[in-house]
């Protein structure tokens, strides 16, 4: 029994052993950083996946689903293509003299006039789209000896037959079609775009009935260029009741140049010119609805925000848009390395510093202090080191956007069948550019993330070194980001350490004296926990032995009866 009492006494002494910081003559001060229960994984130069407290997504992967009409002027083509609006298809008259920043062509657009083709359709479409206007000036061409304003039932304008409003179909007058030779100088200081064409009858009979001659010819020239077109007579697939066709051509006349038109038949003559402008206007095929909203960047899928440096919504864009990349996600670290706080810390829940883990719940700063002293425990953020890290990180996103977000537009590429090899080459070049930008984007983000993590680690180390230089021999590093302070350090003392006004000379003598008076042999926390657990187990075993001995003694005295039945 004496042995049991002695062991129990030893166990109680062990359990009652003071923790560092719980003694009135000492205190514990730990330095730590912010942590969250579930961080975000980012990529760095050295690690494919490293957890940080916070990160910002850099890839815009979705659109609004609608095209914003501000700040860009959007012109909805509705059921008209840009070329139909240019030629003056009757159902596109509403677009006469219109202007735009972006002309939106719809998939439902259709032609409703004389069937035609444009041999260099893509170039004409791109030229007019970039000009951003359908401003048309009528000129007084003199066509002597022919009938003007030809029309067709395939191109209804009101109840009667009609034709493209910007073109003049010339046919024979009586039984003659004289040779036409007309000149028109450009005395203005801007480029003029003339649209003209040639008619391809379906039969020889149609040819002679319209133009007398068995074969016509059209020559349009300037000082810089000349085009001679001969009609191809023959039947073609029927479109809107016609098997004949019109081919549309175009000529640009520079200031000081002269337009010369010579023809003996089949001429579809211009009525005037389109005033050409230089600008950033463009065209886009999209079925996204147009809405009243504000967005700098437009894609065929709809408008997208341009507050991110990259996007993978669509390769085709207009406005100040993020660069297109292949990646669905690229995360930029905007916080420090995340080390979630351990929920169980030994038998007594002792505090620990940044070397072991981070601290959750630090909402007022990234770096801070925790302490245990005679007045209890406490925590406070270090705003100076926090602000130093934030100042350097805040500009990262803006810098990445500045490097990648330029005001440009990526137009659609169109090529005819005969230009298939050019189309393949262009696609290869475009894909290579995207691959290069995707690689550059990933590398740029990885470099920035590496710098952020190194920076935040450095700020933590700076704060620790600053504290160590203040405490000097008055405290001892505990190896986990904490200091054991060998003098009484109340809350005012702790605050002086945090704000840098701590005077170690004031406490020097007390600290040195306490170093020698505190336990002769100080057990490390890991071994101490083991010994405490072993002592606890031995005590429980001895208590069980005592209880069993008491039961046996009671049975012998007859105070307890035990019946065993078999």
Curated annotation (Swiss-Prot):
GO terms for biological process: clathrin-dependent endocytosis of virus by host cell; fusion of virus membrane with host endosome membrane; fusion of virus membrane with host plasma membrane; viral budding from plasma membrane; virion attachment to host cell. Its main location: virion. Disulfide bonds join 30-482, 68-293, 80-92, 113-155, 297-321, 489-493. Residues 17-530 are extracellular. One of its GO terms (molecular function) is host cell surface receptor binding. Glycans are attached at residues 24, 38, 54, 97, 181, 301, 499. Keywords: Clathrin- and caveolin-independent endocytosis of virus by host, Clathrin-mediated endocytosis of virus by host, Disulfide bond, Fusion of virus membrane with host endosomal membrane, Fusion of virus membrane with host membrane, Glycoprotein, Hemagglutinin, Host cell membrane, Host membrane, Host-virus interaction, Lipoprotein, Membrane, Palmitate, Signal, Transmembrane, Transmembrane helix, Viral attachment to host cell, Viral envelope protein, Viral penetration into host cytoplasm, Virion, Virus endocytosis by host, Virus entry into host cell. GO terms for cellular component: host cell plasma membrane; membrane; viral envelope; virion membrane. Residues 1-16 form the signal peptide. The keyword Lipoprotein applies. The record marks 345-346 as: Cleavage. The chain crosses the membrane at residues 531-551. Pfam families: Hemagglutinin (PF00509). Belongs to the influenza viruses hemagglutinin family. Binds to sialic acid-containing receptors on the cell surface, bringing about the attachment of the virus particle to the cell. This attachment induces virion internalization of about two third of the virus particles through clathrin-dependent endocytosis and about one third through a clathrin- and caveolin-independent pathway. Plays a major role in the determination of host range restriction and virulence. Class I viral fusion protein. Binds to sialic acid-containing receptors on the cell surface, bringing about the attachment of the virus particle to the cell. This attachment induces virion internalization either through clathrin-dependent endocytosis or through clathrin- and caveolin-independent pathway. Plays a major role in the determination of host range restriction and virulence. Class I viral fusion protein. Responsible for penetration of the virus into the cell cytoplasm by mediating the fusion of the membrane of the endocytosed virus particle with the endosomal membrane. Major glycoprotein, comprises over 80% of the envelope proteins present in virus particle. This is Hemagglutinin. The gene is HA.
